[in-house]
Amino acid sequence: MTLKERRVGDVSILDLKGRLVLEEGDDILRSRINDLVSEGRIKIVVNLQDVTYVDSCGVGVLIAKYVSVRKKGGDVKLLHLTPRSHRLMEISKLLNVFETFDSEERAVESFAVQRAK
């Protein structure tokens, strides 16, 4: 799996490509989010548009990083879930946990709305 990072204001967007699975993508995502949190960047959008497969380990990384970022006062939101990723999140009841978006603009704007509450 590859990961490219972009920033829109104070929001970090992580564009993933490939398989988010044990020993292929889990360490890459975990490490980058840990680095972002260390830098104080706790508004994170994970773009899953080009992710071809997610296994339970990949889901575990998303959950673990969601929890650790929330403890620091931030949030992790998901963008462009593929039908397969959406179904996996639905089955595992994670659509009730993560905010998901089909629009990058809305995902980024949601942090401003969240702060205003």
Predicted segments with their positions:
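Residues that form or immediately flank small-molecule/cofactor binding pockets and catalytic motifs
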Residues: 8-10, 83, 105
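A charged, well-structured terminal subsegment
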Residues: 100-117
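STAS-typified acidic loop motif
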Residues: 2-31
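Short low-complexity stretches enriched in small and charged residues
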Residues: 1-5, 33, 55, 108
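Amphipathic alpha-helical interaction surfaces in cytosolic regulatory modules
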Residues: 20-98
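General small-molecule cofactor/ligand-binding pocket signal
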Residues: 4-6, 79, 101
